[in-house]
UniProtKB/Swiss-Prot annotation:
It comes from Rhizobium johnstonii (strain DSM 114642 / LMG 32736 / 3841). The keyword ATP-binding applies. InterPro entries: Cyt_trans-like (IPR004821), NadD/NMNAT (IPR005248), Rossmann-like_a/b/a_fold (IPR014729). NCBIfam families: nicotinate (nicotinamide) nucleotide adenylyltransferase, PRK00071.2-2, PRK00071.2-4. Pathway: Cofactor biosynthesis; NAD(+) biosynthesis; deamido-NAD(+) from nicotinate D-ribonucleotide: step 1/1. The gene is nadD. Belongs to the NadD family. The keyword ATP-binding applies. Its EC number is 2.7.7.18. This is Probable nicotinate-nucleotide adenylyltransferase. It catalyses: nicotinate beta-D-ribonucleotide + ATP + H(+) = deamido-NAD(+) + diphosphate.
Length: 199
């Protein structure tokens, strides 16, 4: 895991990043700015249990590309999940919390992930581990309201104007952050296009 100091506010931004692109970098930049992050851990996962491995580029390649895309020095590109041997986000976050009890973590996800978030293993446990910042993505601005996560944890929503103090909230707590959006999509890039209305 990247090094962090006691009291730091650290964003956790996980994904396959297959490939990483400027849309991911934009989400990271918005999160750093709006959440007042000291660091953002760009967590490149060895694999995604919900996605096919057939088109998954080698981890080393995705790490190198992520380093190229993530220019901000506060972004720490890492693949520590491979070392931990964890495949599921809930297990990874539990390990992160246990190893860093004095760091304030926020889980960061694109709004397009909310529609399937309830299919993640122990998804409600994830929501109860760290506060969550959902960053707007093209095509997901309105659909996030109908997501199972938004309905289940509607009581825990924090106003976007208070995003900068989300780290002070006890989970479950989440906020939806609007901002500039990129139409870039890893799926579209893999399929030979650079834009997708769906992601």
């Amino acid at each position: 895991m990247p090094h962090s100091e006691r009291g730091m506010v650290v964003g956790l931004f996980g994904g396959s990043f297959n490939p990483p692109h400027q849309g991911h970098a934009l989400v990271a930049e918005i999160a750093i700015k709006r959440l007042r992050l000291d660091q953002l851990w760009w967590m490149v996962t060895p694999g995604n249990p919900l996605k096919s491995r057939n088109q998954l580029a080698p981890l080393a390649e995705r790490l190198a590309e992520s380093e190229r895309v993530a220019a901000d020095p506060r972004i720490k590109v890492t693949a520590f999940e491979q070392t931990l041997g964890t495949s599921y986000t809930a297990n990874t976050l539990a390990r992160v919390k246990a190893r860093n009890p004095h760091v304030h973590f926020i889980w960061i996800m694109g709004a397009d992930s909310l529609q399937t978030f309830h299919k993640w293993q122990k998804w409600q446990e994830i929501a109860r581990t760290f506060p969550i910042a959902v960053i707007d993505r093209p095509g997901a601005t309105l659909s996030f309201l109908s997501s199972k996560m938004a309905r289940t944890f509607g009581f825990a929503r924090v106003d976007e104007d208070d995003a900068r103090v989300l780290w002070k909230k006890r989970a479950p707590a989440w906020t939806f952050i609007h901002g500039p959006r990129s139409g870039l999509s890893s799926t579209a890039i893999r399929n030979g296009s650079s834009h997708s209305d769906a992601e």
